[in-house]
Amino acid sequence: MILKGRDREAVLIRNANLACAVGKLLLGEMSSWQEFLEPDTIDYAKLPRKQLKSRKYDVQTNLQNRIDRFCDLNFHKMTRTKLISLYEELKAHRTLEIPYLEFCEKYSPITGFYEKGFPEYSTVCISLWGLQYRFPEHDFSNDMVIAINQVNKAEEELESYQKRNHKQLLKNQTEIADIVRKTESAKRQVMQLAFSLLECYLNGLAWSYCQKENISTLSNRKINTLKDTFNVSLRDKIQKYPTIIFGKKIKENSCNFVLDKAKQFRDSLMHPSPFSAPEKFGGYDKLEKLFNLDIETISKTISDIIDIIEEIEAMKGKNSPVPIWLPKIKETAKKLFQRVTKDRTL
């Protein structure tokens, strides 16, 4: 259908306004969905002729150029037409969550995405908060930051009671018990989250490799090792994924503590039981591990897991961006490491 005159001008103005609305939403500049939807509620064809001409002039001399600059600055292949399609999808659902690769195929790759350290299995999340990304390491690392801070805070609170004799402590038994419960809970969270972070990082490596490389050249055993992330053990992921993907091995002393010591605590938390672990897994007392998870073990676990991740990251080469979540977890963990070092010197 060929539009003429007023109708063609109305469509031109409407489309430009819809594209602008999407741009503002992606930048987090929309105050409400009502504001976002407003450009689509106007019957532009019924505007007075003078107003229609004025808006058309503004679109052609200003608005379209602003839209094009926005696309060029933030996307590789975004167009006005694609922005309008994105508007229609957002109008239907209000928010949008879509895998990054699907977003690239449907709309456009996003400028600076890989350079900033986001993994390609990220989910693109568009809402009134703007354009954001979500992926497992992001969630687990943020959870770890919170839990580590809770450990530090509770330990600081306990320090104020250290120089008191037991008779004095009995007077504050309720307060002390509450602090101890907080620190014990936070330590359990840190241990579980540290392993979850490591495993989702390793699974992400395998997924990315399978997406980019021609894995048909690999043996069936190696393909299954990469793809069957549910049944492949953590030990095999740490030791085999770097070899398959980068042709390099993790140093044995890098993962000994995590696999042979820390994992016993983690397994006792994930599978608590009065039964001891099977002999092939060390035959250790699960309850003993469950009840005696101390700050030194937590600190060593975090330190070694960070070292494993950084060793693998180094295999990617100097030009590979640092995972966007890694600096924050390192900075937070440093405070815990300092606390452990301080306690040892007392």
Go through each PLM region and give its residues.
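Charged alpha-helical initiation segments
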Residues: 1-25, 80-187
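Histidine-centered, metal-coordinating catalytic motifs and their short helical/loop contexts
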Residues: 252-284
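Polyanionic, low-complexity intrinsically disordered segments
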Residues: 1-68, 275-346
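N-terminal accessory interaction module
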Residues: 46-102
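A solvent-exposed, charged loop/short amphipathic helix patch at secondary-structure junctions
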Residues: 166-174, 218-223, 281-292
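Charged, amphipathic alpha-helical oligomerization/scaffolding segments
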Residues: 197, 257-264, 268, 297-300, ...
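Short non-catalytic regulatory patches outside canonical folded cores
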Residues: 202-260, 272
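Short, hydrophobic, well-ordered secondary-structure elements
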Residues: 182-209
